[in-house]
């Protein structure tokens, strides 16, 4: 399983720290998905994936504002006590005292951005999908033959490079060798 550091996410998306309990290089994220905590704000946790970054936008913030401060704190404390890797507030929204207290109590990094929630989610998911995509390593030679890419693969020493050299002598293009 691949991971990406919170520091890389912050740099890529130009996120500003609001509360950072530890070095963002040491916070590793393994989920490509993000979570806008609508159900969790209503105390439904059956499908709450704590490996995802939480995103708070206008809808989540408006819902929280509609609750009294004590209820708001209980909701946020329950969400952050499960220790998600980080939370991000979109649209330049200022965090409530209850949110700041809940992330501080539980050591969860809180970040902010002026981006719209939709833009933030799209950019974050695209970045995480690229960074956490499955990958494999193969020994091989990539050549172009009649406009098509061909990957010659095989065990070390079976003659992949020699085959590519013969193709190059016949006017084909080498793209990459090991």
Where are these regions (language model features)?
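Fold-independent oxyanion-binding glycine-rich loops
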Residues: 57-59, 91-92, 114, 146-148, ...
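P-loop NTPase nucleotide-binding/switch module
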Residues: 127-147
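Gly/Thr-rich phosphate-binding loop signature of adenosyl cofactor/nucleotide-binding cores
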Residues: 1-80
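Amphipathic coiled-coil/heptad-repeat helices and related helical stalk/stem segments
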Residues: 71-72, 136, 160
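Charged, amphipathic alpha-helical linker segments immediately N-terminal to NTP-binding catalytic cores
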Residues: 83-86, 92-127
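Hydrophobic/aromatic ligand-binding patch that stacks against planar heteroaromatic rings
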Residues: 78, 102, 166-167
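Glycine-rich phosphate-binding P-loop
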Residues: 147-175
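Structural motif
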Residues: 52-55, 85-88, 108-111, 149-151, ...
């Amino acid at each position: 399983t691949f991971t990406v550091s919170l520091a890389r996410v912050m740099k890529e998306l130009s996120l500003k720290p609001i509360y950072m309990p530890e070095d963002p290089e040491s916070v590793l994220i393994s989920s490509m998905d993000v979570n806008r905590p609508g159900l969790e704000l209503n105390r439904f946790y059956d499908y709450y994936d704590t490996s995802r970054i939480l995103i708070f936008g206008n809808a989540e913030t408006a819902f929280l504002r509609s609750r009294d401060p004590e209820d708001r704190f209980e909701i946020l404390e329950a969400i952050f006590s499960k220790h998600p890797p980080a939370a991000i507030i979109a649209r330049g929204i200022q965090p409530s005292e209850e949110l700041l207290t809940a992330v501080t109590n539980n050591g969860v990094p809180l970040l902010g951005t002026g981006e719209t929630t939709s833009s933030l989610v799209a950019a974050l998911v695209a970045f995480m999908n690229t960074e956490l995509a499955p990958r494999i390593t193969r020994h091989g030679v990539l050549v172009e033959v009649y406009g098509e890419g061909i990957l010659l693969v095989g065990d070390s020493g079976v003659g992949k490079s020699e085959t590519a050299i013969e193709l190059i002598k016949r006017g084909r293009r080498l793209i990459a060798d090991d």
